Amino acid sequence: SLHDALPISHKINRGEKVSLDNKSMDFFFLKRYEADKIINVTLQLIKQKLPKFVGASEYDIQVLTPMRKGLLGVERLNTILQMYLNPPSDRKKEKEHGAIVFREGDKVMQIKNNYQLEWEIRSKYGLCIDKGTGVFNGDTGIIEEINDFAETITVNFDEGRMVEYSYKLLDELELAYAVTIHKSQGSEYPAVVIPLLSGP
């Protein structure tokens, strides 16, 4: 329901003060003053509370932040969220690329348009039932397979589009447990968590 969220978002857009009394079913505010406490409550919301409340998986709940760097920036949050939601396992292959470790089961995002990248949709038996080209900035998916022999990472994007990335194309992917508010524009999620820390 967007009963409370829409009027609140309109007030925010107009620069008006918003009541944070937590009487809304769609919008609530949890006050914490230190980055570590904010991260802990964010993890609890994603893993335990929100999936039950909104009926969505932890992968569908999106963390949004205004910054890339800093204590609550995308880069740090993605590392923490990856460890919490998709920790290392002997059963999951990994590929290190720069400062990022991609792992089977990771939530990832395409970060620039690639009109030549091929995709296909497969039946439950693995047969190709549709194919095309083009993966676009902001598309999100889950890493299905990392194949060191073929040097590829296969990502299952929304609508079941399977895309095989050669290791040479990994600059086009980043972890997507947390994304910037700017990057999320135009996307829809069943729930979002926005961890914020007041500046000096």
Predicted regions and their residues:
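Conserved helicase motor core of P-loop NTPases
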Residues: S1, A5-T133
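Conserved nucleotide-binding/hydrolysis modules and their immediate coupling elements
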Residues: T79-M83, P87-P200
